[in-house]
Amino acid sequence: MTKDDLSFIFEDELEKGICPKCRKNKTEVDFFTGEDILCTDCRKLINKEIGYDTLKQNANVPKAYYIYSWRNYDENFFKKIVEATNRFKNNLHLVGGSFTGKTVLMIACIDYLIKYGENSILFYNVPELLTNAQKECYSYYNYLINKCSHIRFLFLDDIFNGLNSSENKFLYEILDYRNRNNLPTVSATNVKINDARIYSRLLRNNGVEIEINSKFWRKANER
């Protein structure tokens, strides 16, 4: 197992169509439109042409984190993550203290997804997301719920306890929709989530919780 051999994690089991761009590779069919989706090879090429940093910006990744990828990780820790990730179908929940590398791990997942050809990705720091949802107008509140609910891969960093009723409703609505529609959510926290409804939806659909106790990632300039 190498750090570039991660394709099995995100491969779709159903391959029914032919790529409409290259007309040679097998691909999946869009559930809603019935049309063939671009194959992985074509999506990879398109993302490379757009630019990885541009796609990270579109995904709301903080600029300071653009440099991080799977190569920032200790080899032994990497193997443990691959093993755990191979077991989860939709949701992945990271738990650990401050400065243990949870956010960097999430960014490494995003980096891999982009290089694998995905572009329907969003990253949000939860306190910032909730603040934006409450201070803006009602239409923007609904826009954020719709955006977070329907994106293919959602990454929620720094989930915390003590949500007020409106914050709880906002987060619950997003997570519940994603679970019902089998959309993957990757979350991270440095506390034990004590809200049973929120916690259960972070781990539904064969979700996996990984506890991170040590700082296993390396700085980019130490690769």
Named regions from a protein language model:
Residues 89-107:
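Walker A/P-loop nucleotide-binding motif
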Residues 119, 150-153, 180-187:
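Loop/turn-to-beta-strand initiation segments
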Residues 104-118:
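P-loop NTPase Walker A phosphate-binding motif
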Residues 79, 114-150:
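Short glycine-rich substrate-engagement loop in P-loop NTPases that contacts/grips substrate
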Residues 153-154, 161:
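Alpha-helical transmembrane segments of helical membrane proteins, especially in multi-pass transport
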Residues 1-79, 210, 217-223:
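A short, basic N-terminal segment
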Residues 77-87:
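Pre-Walker A adenine-sensing motif
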